[in-house]
């Protein structure tokens, strides 16, 4: 619903930030998107190994809603980055660096999810929203979420 010509607007319009700030904001978003897939795959591999004892491409594809060739391509990328080791006929295993990344990702997710729960968001929505948000918040914001959660409890009780 647009406003008519000649009618004053009551909403305050946010001014554009300077060019450097704008560029930095978009750079951070691009970097977060790049890391998002890596984090999600590494965390899923860790979860599958913990829950079912192995991480198979077919299981990853099913859980991520993608094709097996898509998973295979990403696994090659993760291996080249040093996060996983693929052993033929045995599956996918995390390297120590991959384990570290999976743990960091899991912790970020938990901090965001707990924060949303304290705000009163339902558990199902908090879990789902945290999955997207965890990749796009700075360490400063995570620290603030954690401090707020510790001050106000760990869930909406």
Swiss-Prot record:
Manganese found in the keyword field: yes
Organism field: Salmonella typhimurium (strain LT2 / SGSC1412 / ATCC 700720)
Cited function: In the presence of manganese, represses expression of mntH and mntS. Up-regulates expression of mntP.
Family: Belongs to the DtxR/MntR family.
GO molecular function: DNA binding; DNA-binding transcription factor activity; protein dimerization activity; transition metal ion binding
Domain notes: It contains an N-terminal DNA-binding domain and a metal-binding domain.
InterPro entries named among the record's database cross-references: DtxR_MntR_Metal-Reg, Fe_dep_repressor, Fe_dep_repressor_sf, HTH_DTXR, Iron_dep_repressor, WH-like_DNA-bd_sf, WH_DNA-bd_sf
Subunit structure of this chain's protein: Homodimer.
Residues covered by the HTH dtxR-type domain: 34-95
Keyword annotations: Activator, Cytoplasm, DNA-binding, Manganese, Repressor, Transcription, Transcription regulation
One Pfam family per UniProt: Fe_dep_repr_C
Keyword presence, Metal-binding: no
Compartment(s) of residence: Cytoplasm
A GO CC term attached to the entry: cytoplasm
Name of encoding gene: mntR
Name of protein: Transcriptional regulator MntR
